[in-house]
């Protein structure tokens, strides 16, 4: 199964869009989002409490003092960073494009939930969080180059670490497409994935193998800043669906009503 169905047709649409939007720093309604009709699927063959889980974020995290992502690249920056999960969040910076970094600068867990996932490891919700996570700047309009150049290298690194499942967290609308395509490539390589989502249309078009959707905000996809319980609930429900899913699809996370009640009570 192709990561981008009818990729040559998509290239033509993208080339036409590029010709008309050479200086565009953001997307408009004419951008040719990838339209897939089917999804690859790899079932999880072990329980959450026994697996090595990888985190993939498209919020543009990089280590302070190292090279940033190129947020001016017309087709997007096709590189990724491999970062130790034990890093102090204060040592990270975010090259934000396509989303407001205010929330992630307030609480990195809203896009990079290392603290929450390490809690899950301690509580044996997951076997372990992989010792490295992967960071992209997910504003990548050139989807064809992404799947041909970036995704194979990312899959190679996941296999090197013997990752058994991957959680993908987008930051912007275009990030939803970027990580949906990455998830398709990872799943084709035999590694189950789960993608969080707050933009329904993007995942309906790109067809990631599994997506947990709720009506959240770009730049705060794992939950509201400084509200650990909200973040835990979103992650817990999404991850447990990896275990139970028997076919590809999108699942609406039942986190909104409970969160509204908690907020009204001041339980944050």
Regions found by a protein language model. Give the residues of each.
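Metallocofactor- and cofactor-centric catalytic cores in central/energy metabolism, strongly enriched
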Residues: 1-268
């Amino acid at each position: 199964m192709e990561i981008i169905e009818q990729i040559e047709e998509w290239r033509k649409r993208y080339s036409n869009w590029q010709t008309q939007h050479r200086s565009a720093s953001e997307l408009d309604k004419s951008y040719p989002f990838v339209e897939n009709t089917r999804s690859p699927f790899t079932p999880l063959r072990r329980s959450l409490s026994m697996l090595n889980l990888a985190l993939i974020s498209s919020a543009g995290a990089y280590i302070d003092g190292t090279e940033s992502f190129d947020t001016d690249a017309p087709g997007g920056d096709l590189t990724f960073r491999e970062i130790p999960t034990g890093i102090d969040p204060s040592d990270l910076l975010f090259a934000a494009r396509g989303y407001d970094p205010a929330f992630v600068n307030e609480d990195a867990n809203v896009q990079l939930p290392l603290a929450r996932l390490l809690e899950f490891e301690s509580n044996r919700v997951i076997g372990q969080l992989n010792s490295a996570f992967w960071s992209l700047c997910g504003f990548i309009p050139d989807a064809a180059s992404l799947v041909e150049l970036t995704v194979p290298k990312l899959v190679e690194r996941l296999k090197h670490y013997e990752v058994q499942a991957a959680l993908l967290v987008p930051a912007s609308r275009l990030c939803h497409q970027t990580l949906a395509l990455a998830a398709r490539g990872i799943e084709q390589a035999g590694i189950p994935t789960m993608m969080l989502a707050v933009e329904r249309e993007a995942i309906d078009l790109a067809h990631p193998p599994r997506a947990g959707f709720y009506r959240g905000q770009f730049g705060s996809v794992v939950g509201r800043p400084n509200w650990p319980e909200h973040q835990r609930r979103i992650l817990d429900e999404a991850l447990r669906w990896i275990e139970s899913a028997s076919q590809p699809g999108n699942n609406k996370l039942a986190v909104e009503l409970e969160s509204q009640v908690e907020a009204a009570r001041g339980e944050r």
